[in-house]
Amino acid sequence: MSNINYAPTIWSRADALKVNENDPTTTQPLVSPDFPVMSDTVFIWDTMPLRELDGTVVSVNGWSVIVTLTADRHPDDPQYVGANGRYDIKRDWEDRHGRARMCYWYSRTGKDWIFGGRVMAEGVSPTTREWAGTPVLLNDKGDIDLYYTCVTPGAAIAKVRGRIVTSDKGVELKDFTEVKTLFEADGKYYQTEAQNSTWNFRDPSPFIDPNDGKLYMVFEGNVAGERGTHTVGAAELGPVPPGHEETGGARFQVGCIGLAVAKDLSGDEWEILPPLVTAVGVNDQTERPHYVFQDGKYYLFTISHKFTYADGVTGPDGVYGFVGEHLFGPYRPMNASGLVLGNPPAQPFQTYSHCVMPNGLVTSFIDSVPTSGEDYRIGGTEAPTVRILLEGDRSFVQEVYDYGYIPAMKNVVLS
């Protein structure tokens, strides 16, 4: 279907050694432990603003819409009540992934979100878990394609089409009833469950390439191959300093940012392409990849964790980025290391699952914030929005806004 040739960009161990967790220009400001919670009845985490295929965050008839991974809170469930008779919110929070559902929220102000409910009714999605993706407004009729990940059994990139209906009182997402599976990991470019039982394959983010006008999608994957068989060679090492040639068990970390191209703009048929960026020997997770197109450059962002780094390299939970002049690369790690926005060392788990929007605003959710002593407070709610400035290959943290502030860049009036 396509005749596309390119070599993946390698995020090397030498690049990762440049990560500086104490650089104030790439550190997310501290989140206060007295943060507000947007709901007492549900946890939210990965947040997906409604957008168009060029990345523009949109409102519809004046209503902003976000989709979130959502799970009920269980304060009265006996399995989450500790020996002291109190609600064990930590365990409830840690169990959320197995019951993740796509839910939506709406707002007139780009904050103060009102809960709308499930996007898909129970039983519509073919798997037990609904994991992250991207909601795309297709036209001024209100049609929406929700790209997402069907997980357990297996993991597949899928989409479901529905529509948005608005009134003076609120928003309804309707008719999301038929899920179309698009593709799964192929074993040639992307690791399968058979090759590695803890494989990663998820988080579709479709976009129109501003240069060729075609519909593509980035997603999280792992480089294909049986677990433990990958080689951390000279290219994966990069120009490391003396004493850093030993890689330990780094061959087990094989994250990558994947790419696929659609047959046409309907997005119903896709061809899997080689990864754009590989992190063999550096990191095992490159979650929720997405683009910002600015100043003739392709800014490719992803999120990752400290605990998924390979032996001998480390970095904070947060946003990592790569920049290039062409979709197919080559890319350069932003700020020389790849780190764009990391949690502060004093609060290493305060936020995660950042989404960088074309206006420079970055949304994320609150995970856990230290309170006193060894105690901490679980979030499961929107974090303060921050703004970053992109200048060439560099980025700078600029401002902090309200919790969950996700303003529309454009309002679409339905015909």
From Swiss-Prot:
Gene3D superfamilies: Glycosyl hydrolase domain, family 43 (2.115.10.20)
Reactions performed catalytically: [6)-beta-D-fructofuranosyl-(2->](n) alpha-D-glucopyranoside + sucrose = [6)-beta-D-fructofuranosyl-(2->](n+1) alpha-D-glucopyranoside + D-glucose
Statement: the UniProt record of this protein carries the keyword Glycosyltransferase: yes
Enzyme Commission (EC) number: 2.4.1.10
InterPro entries attached to this UniProt entry: Glyco_hydro_68, Glyco_hydro_beta-prop_sf
Gene Ontology terms, MF aspect: levansucrase activity
GO term, biological process aspect, one: carbohydrate utilization
Keywords: Carbohydrate metabolism, Glycosyltransferase, Periplasm, Transferase
Active site (catalytic residues): D46 (nucleophile), E287 (proton donor/acceptor)
Enzyme type, top EC level: transferase
Binding positions (sucrose): W45, D46, A132, R202, D203
Pfam (any one): Glyco_hydro_68
Inducing stimuli: A phage-associated promoter element (PAPE), which includes the first 48 nucleotides of the gene, is present in lscB and lscC, but not in lscA. It probably explains the lack of expression of lscA in P.syringae.
SUPFAM superfamilies: Arabinanase/levansucrase/invertase (SSF75005)
GO cellular component, one term: periplasmic space
Cysteines engaged in disulfide bonds, as pairs: none
Top-rank taxon, per record: Bacteria
Site, Transition state stabilizer: residue positions: D203
Knockout mutant characteristics: Disruption mutant does not exhibit a levan-deficient phenotype. The lscA-lscB and lscA-lscC double mutants also do not exhibit a levan-deficient phenotype. Insertion of an antibiotic resistance cassette in the recombinant lscA gene abolishes levan synthesis when expressed in E.coli.
Location(s), subcellular: Periplasm
Additional facts recorded: Strain PG4180 contains three levansucrase-encoding genes: lscA, lscB and lscC. Of the three copies, only lscB and lscC have been shown to be expressed while no expression was observed for lscA under the tested growth conditions.
Function: Catalyzes the synthesis of levan, a fructose polymer, by transferring the fructosyl moiety from sucrose to a growing acceptor molecule. LscA encodes a functional enzyme in vitro, when expressed in E.coli under control of the vector-based lactose promoter (Plac), and it can restore levan production to the lscB-lscC double mutant. However, lscA is not expressed in P.savastanoi pv. glycinea PG4180 under standard conditions. It could be an ancestral Lsc variant in P.syringae.
Protein family per UniProt: Belongs to the glycosyl hydrolase 68 family.
Protein name as annotated: Levansucrase LscA
Source organism of the structure: Pseudomonas savastanoi pv. glycinea (Pseudomonas syringae pv. glycinea)
This protein's encoding gene: lscA
